[in-house]
Amino acid sequence: FIISPLGLVGPFERIFNSIQSGVPTHSQAVISDFMDEGYFATHIRRMRSIYAERYHALRDLSERYLPEFLDIQPTQSGLHTVGFLKQDTDEIALSLALDKKGVSALPLSRYCLKKIDNKGFTLGFGAVNPDQIKSSIIIMADTFNELI
């Protein structure tokens, strides 16, 4: 809802109605059948398995290639985890260096309004397969060895 002066209620309603389009009835029916027939639950189970495999690849490869640099945090769900830096170093400089090499590891400070003591990165694993995770971890290890 929106609070507006009485004289603007009409114009706001017209603008809202012109940009607000609901989901077409046909699409709603297809999605309803998809869910009623159990395909949605099957899809969720399949994706959970895929994401768990990718998380474990990230964790295991980090333990193998980055043990002196990152402490990967456990996660039971989601598509990202946190890797805390074990050394006091410039997470932003590391993130920028990784970005130049095609690896996205966003610094935790990006998500904080106040300065925090823990430095590290958010690491996504949902959109990359285990082979891509391995090549990214190797790039991270090489970059960390160069800069730390």
Task: Give the residues covered by each predicted segment.
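Conserved PLP-binding active-site segment of the aspartate aminotransferase-like
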Residues: 82-87, 105-143
